Design a protein with these regions (language model features):
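Juxtamembrane helix-entry segments on the extracytoplasmic side of multipass membrane proteins
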Residues: 8-16, 40-46, 113, 118-137, ...
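Specific transmembrane alpha-helical segments of multi-pass solute transporters/efflux pumps
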Residues: 1-2, 27-75, 79, 87, ...
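Hydrophobic/aromatic residues within transmembrane alpha-helices
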Residues: 5, 14, 18, 66, ...
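Cytoplasmic-side transmembrane-helix entry/capping segments in multi-pass membrane proteins
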Residues: 42-52, 98-109, 128, 151-161, ...
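Transmembrane alpha-helices of multi-pass small-molecule transport proteins
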Residues: 7-58, 85, 137-141, 158-176, ...
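Hydrophobic transmembrane alpha-helices of multi-pass small-molecule transport proteins
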Residues: 26, 89, 93, 98-118, ...
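Helix-helix packing/entry segments at the starts of transmembrane helices
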Residues: 15-17, 60, 74-83, 144-165, ...
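Hydrophobic residues within alpha-helical transmembrane segments
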Residues: 17-21, 50, 54, 81, ...
Length: 263
């Protein structure tokens, strides 16, 4: 759906509208709960601010620039990189467990990403790098958000949505020439409410209870659903590279799930 919206809305403006829509969706749930004492903790606020910058401001814009340059099915598959990056960052910076199977799984996912980018040449590599950088931003966001305990998931999502949405929309209005048509605005807000607001709120709930890497593994089924939607609902042609990449990435994600279950 975001690929369709990009035809009439610029990447910065669309990122802003998606996150503002997400904030609007969860706002009714954001006025109760949480810990006022923890919210005053400087470390908590710093982690949340970094999560807003990486996950709300930078990640969506990088993804949308990549989506504008590549088929939606390919971008959906590249999003599997987020699972790997989240696990690696959780190990490197947040001291979560990383075993040999997870390393092999990471190699399989990266191999799938390379296979997907190669047939498109330079344009494919550029699009793949943009999506990969978005996944790094979201990997940092996932780990930081899992450690923010003074805010409820709805409050965290609302803060991300309002903060990142306002910044990106302001940049879009300056760089991309004003607001898009009302159809584009309403469409982006509706998609944002469901795919960003409720999705992020539910993900944060899981991340705070399960840890960043485990919750990301469950979330990793969504890229494959995105591929099916791109093929069957939006009529994108399926390619051999996409089937091959899906095989590598599916094997990698399955291996990570097995490793996490046994651990």
């Amino acid at each position: 759906v975001a690929k369709t919206l990009l035809a009439s809305v610029g990447p910065f403006t669309l990122a802003g509208l998606l996150y503002l829509g997400g904030a609007l969706g969860v706002l009714p749930f954001a006025f109760r709960g949480g810990s006022p004492q923890l919210r005053r903790d400087r470390r908590q606020r710093r982690m949340l601010a970094l999560a807003v910058v990486f996950g709300g401001c930078l990640g969506p814009v990088l993804l949308l620039f990549g989506l504008r340059a590549a088929p939606a099915a390919s971008v959906s598959l590249w999003l599997n990189t987020e699972t790997v990056v989240t696990a690696i960052l959780a190990w490197g910076f947040f001291h979560e467990h990383l075993d040999r199977r997870t390393v092999i799984a990471a190699a399989l996912v990266f191999a799938g990403g390379l296979l997907l980018a190669a047939p498109a040449g330079a344009a494919g590599w550029r699009a793949g790098m943009l999506v990969a950088l978005a996944c790094v931003c979201w990997g940092l966001d996932n780990n930081l958000t899992a450690l923010v305990s003074g805010f409820t998931p709805a409050q965290t999502t609302a803060i991300k949505g309002i903060g990142a949405g306002t910044v990106n929309l302001a940049i879009g209005l300056v760089l991309e020439g004003g607001l898009p048509p009302w159809s584009g605005i309403l469409g982006a807000l509706a998609v944002g409410t469901l795919s960003y607001g409720f999705s992020i709120m539910l993900y944060i709930s899981g991340a705070q209870q399960l840890g960043a890497s485990r919750s990301q593994l469950l979330f990793s089924t969504s890229p494959f659903l995105g591929v099916l939607l791109a093929w069957f609902m939006f009529g994108e042609p399926a390619t051999a590279a996409q089937f091959g990449a899906a095989g590598f990435m599916g094997a990698g994600i399955a291996l990570m799930l097995t490793a996490r279950h046994e651990h």
